[in-house]
């Protein structure tokens, strides 16, 4: 079971169906490591998949990296699962720009959770991306201010057998025949209808 499936199994903690229906892309970073001593850093590897609005089908996964830092009195290490629900084409383009920073863009908001989260704030209604995180089984709207998302060229090359950009993978469908890709797309189709 994927991190996203685990999150969706708890209806009171899940991403509301309203946002799943509107989603144009999904980004999942399982097991992002966050650590700190005086200052803090976090780093994770994940995948991006984009929905084709004409065919309602999902792209093969493009591998991405999430990195960031923070200041202040911090000590310790924790593991966080991060989920980003991208609500429009502009949000996708920002993610693919390799200059995207969560928190630097007003288009990112902590996402609502649970069955009754339909009455969203104005910030969430204007957002391009809703962010969620889960730490030790607790799942809530995430604040990942300062985190940068970039394409993970090495992981894409290792998975697809050649150098591909995230844009080539999600828009041109290059790599759709790689064995695990159909299972990934089937999982997305179960939740994003």
Task: Show where each model-derived region lies.
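Small-residue-enriched, tightly packed secondary-structure blocks
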Residues: 1-193
């Amino acid at each position: 079971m994927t991190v996203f499936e685990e999150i969706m199994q708890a209806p009171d903690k899940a991403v509301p169906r309203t946002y799943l229906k509107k989603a144009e892309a999904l980004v999942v970073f399982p097991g992002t490591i966050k650590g700190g001593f005086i200052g803090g850093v976090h780093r994770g590897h994940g995948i991006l998949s984009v929905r084709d609005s004409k065919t309602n089908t999902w792209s093969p996964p493009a591998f991405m990296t999430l990195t960031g830092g923070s200041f202040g009195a911090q000590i310790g290490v924790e593991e966080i699962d991060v989920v980003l629900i991208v609500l429009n084409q502009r949000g996708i383009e920002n993610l693919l720009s390799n200059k995207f920073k969560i928190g630097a863009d007003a288009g990112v908001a902590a996402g609502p959770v649970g069955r009754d989260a339909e009455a969203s704030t104005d910030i969430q209604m204007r957002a391009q991306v809703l962010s969620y995180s889960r730490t030790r089984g607790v799942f809530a709207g995430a604040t990942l201010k300062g985190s940068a998302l970039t394409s993970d060229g090495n992981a894409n090359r290792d998975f697809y057998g050649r150098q591909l950009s995230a844009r080539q993978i999600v828009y041109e469908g290059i790599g759709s025949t790689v064995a695990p890709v159909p299972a990934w797309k089937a999982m997305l189709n179960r939740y994003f209808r």
